């Protein structure tokens, strides 16, 4: 099974964060859209993508928008990853066996989903795709009623695509 496409209903889930808080998708969607970014700490493409997701979180995170990293690693390794890459958005732990990753059809990481408040996947991206991440930024801006900001800074040399 491939990752769930745009238009699919997002499976509802509850996971524990790396700091021990229980978080669930249904509650998060009540306040606005959710970006769920699945990753592994050892994945070079995930390491490359994480700082761009942090930029999105810094630009839009708050009362109208949620961004979660969903780690396929244990809490200790996930906390270390977040510290190393200066990640402030919450990191949730998908327990051994990856039940949530499996529900979303994850075969490659990073896999990033923009989930609209009604629970449908509006945008999805597998690997690093500059175009897909820009679409997610635009969808986030529109959903939060704020001006769009770019993931990418002027002068940065960013590949269009980097497989996961």
Residue ranges: model-predicted function:
Residues 47-85, 99-100:
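Structural microenvironment flanking redox-active thiols in thiol-disulfide oxidoreductases
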Residues 20, 113-122, 126:
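Short, glycine-anchored, charge-dense loop/turn motifs used at functional sites
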Residues 1-34, 79, 84, 105-108, ...:
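Non-globular targeting/processing and membrane-anchoring segments
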Residues 40, 72, 117:
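Cofactor-binding loop segments of dinucleotide-utilizing enzymes, especially the Rossmann-like FAD-
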Residues 25-47, 53:
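Short active-site neighborhood of thiol/selenol oxidoreductases, capturing the structured segment around
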Residues 83-118:
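Short, internal strand/loop/helix patches
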Residues 16, 44, 122:
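Nucleotide phosphate-binding site architecture
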